[in-house]
Amino acid sequence: MKILLLTLVVVTIVCLDLAYTRTCFRTPYKPETCPPGQNLCYKKSWCDAFCSSRGKVIELGCTAKCPTVKDGKDITCCATDNCNTVANWKSR
C-alpha cells in the first residue's frame, strides 16, 4: 500500500512539472520561460530622443494579454515559442 501511495505521489509531481509554459525573448535579448498565465510573447518598439542615431527602443517580453497600442509605439504579439525576434539581433 505504501508503494502504491508513493508511486501516485511521484506520478503527480512528474505530471505537474511537465505542464507546458511559453518561452519568449525578453529584454535584454535572451529566451526565458514565461510566468504561468502569460502565454503570449510581445515586441514593443518606439522612438526616443536618440532614435535618429540609435534606432528605435525595443522591449521584448511575455504577457497574458496583448498590450494596448499607444501613439508612437508599435506592438506585435505572437503565440509560439521565441516568436518575438528582432531581425538584426542574434540569440546568445
Swiss-Prot record:
Keyword flag Iron-sulfur: no
Disulfide bonds: C24-C41, C34-C62, C47-C51, C66-C77, C78-C83
GO molecular function term, any single one: ion channel regulator activity
Subcellular location: Secreted
CDD domains noted in UniProt: TFP_snake_toxin (cd00206)
Tissue expression: Expressed by the venom gland.
InterPro entries: Snake_3FTx (IPR003571), Snake_toxin-like_sf (IPR045860), Snake_toxin_con_site (IPR018354), Toxin_cobra-type (IPR054131)
Designated name of the protein: Long neurotoxin 1
Organism the protein comes from: Hydrophis hardwickii (Hardwick's spine-bellied seasnake)
